[in-house]
Amino acid sequence: MKRILILGASGFIGNTLYKELNSYYKTFGTYFTKKGFGQNHHFFHFDIEEGGLESIIKEAKPKLIISALRGPFEALIETHQFLIDLIDNSNCRLIFLSSANVFDTFEHFPSYEYDKTLSESIYGRFKIKIENKLLRLAPAKYILVRLPMVFGNHS
């Protein structure tokens, strides 16, 4: 059975993906502060500022990593650089959940998959920085998903 690791599986998007994929794949996830995940043996505590992702990956042995992480931008950039290096030298793949904010400068025009990214927001520029790092990988090694605004159940 294919093994999947969802980074940020305690968040809204990550947990929704975990619940959907768990029935079909050997699925693992990370959590930071959410209570109730510590007893789940498929969840690992992960503090992005302290690291420890390497040991989680060694234990989970994923063939696919889904990044739904959030946190301080610099720590996220370092974590994704680690993931890119890992994926470049293994048979693992990455799905990176980015944002439509990479196009927020073009608010009066539609944006398409292959359009040049340009953002006025700090968040959009941060996502562009990680996307540009991913472009150095072989295309078969990653999938880039640009999500629009996502609202929770009670929004």
Regions found by a protein language model. Give the residues of each.
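Conserved Rossmann-fold NAD(P)-dependent oxidoreductase catalytic core, especially the SDR/UDP-sugar
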Residues: 82-120
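N-terminal Rossmann NAD(P)H-binding glycine-rich loop of SDR-like oxidoreductase domains
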Residues: 1-24
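Active-site Tyr-X1-5-Lys
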Residues: 118-143
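SDR active-site strand-loop-helix element
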Residues: 7, 30, 68, 94-99, ...
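NAD(P)-cofactor binding segment of oxidoreductase domains
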Residues: 56-95
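Rossmann-fold cofactor-recognition segment
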Residues: 32-51, 71
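Flexible, glycine-rich beta-alpha linker
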Residues: 145-155
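Short, hydrophobic beta-strand segments that form beta-sheet elements in well-ordered domains
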Residues: 4-6, 24-32, 65
